[in-house]
């Protein structure tokens, strides 16, 4: 079963890193179940967004899991997200509070989510509504801004003309 995961807005201007958080989630998934990570993605969102922190990027991945593991994947993601919320609750106060969102889709998501999010401002309320209508599973808290990047990360479709950015951190 092909699954798309997207994560955005787990970082603060002074601490945290969405890329590192996403890597922790993918490692946890790999340790708990038999899966193949087919593709990792970095989505650079519209650079003029009001709520951007540092790099204004969201992370995504496409993984293959056994159909019998669909509920296990949801449980792993739910438990991980609960721990993430505890972690980000300890971040210092900020004018731009974190707004973590983790998106899971077992179907293709509307590709315009990606194109809209990289080309201009997208109202989080609209994506939240659309995601609910497509069957995407969303983990979020009170602030919903992270839904834009998380959904953009699950909706991009690569093709033969796509380019890739190599990411490394230590």
Residue positions per predicted region:
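Conserved mixed alpha/beta catalytic, RNA-binding, or beta-rich assembly cores of soluble enzyme
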Residues: 3-170
């Amino acid at each position: 079963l092909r699954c798309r995961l997207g994560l955005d807005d787990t970082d603060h201007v002074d601490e945290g890193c969405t890329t590192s958080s996403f890597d922790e989630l993918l490692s946890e998934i790999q340790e708990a179940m038999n899966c193949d990570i087919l593709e990792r993605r970095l989505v650079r969102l519209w650079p003029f967004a009001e709520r951007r922190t540092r790099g204004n990027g969201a992370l995504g991945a496409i993984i293959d899991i056994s159909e019998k593991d669909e509920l296990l994947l949801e449980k792993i993601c739910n438990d991980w997200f609960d721990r993430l919320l505890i972690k980000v609750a300890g971040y210092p106060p900020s004018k731009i509070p974190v707004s973590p969102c983790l998106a899971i889709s077992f179907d293709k998501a509307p590709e315009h989510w990606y194109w809209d999010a990289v080309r201009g401002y997208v109202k989080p309320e609209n994506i939240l509504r659309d995601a609910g209508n497509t069957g995407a599973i969303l983990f979020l808290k009170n602030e919903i801004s992270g839904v834009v990047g998380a959904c953009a990360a699950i909706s991009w479709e690569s093709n033969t003309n796509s380019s890739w950015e190599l990411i490394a951190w230590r």
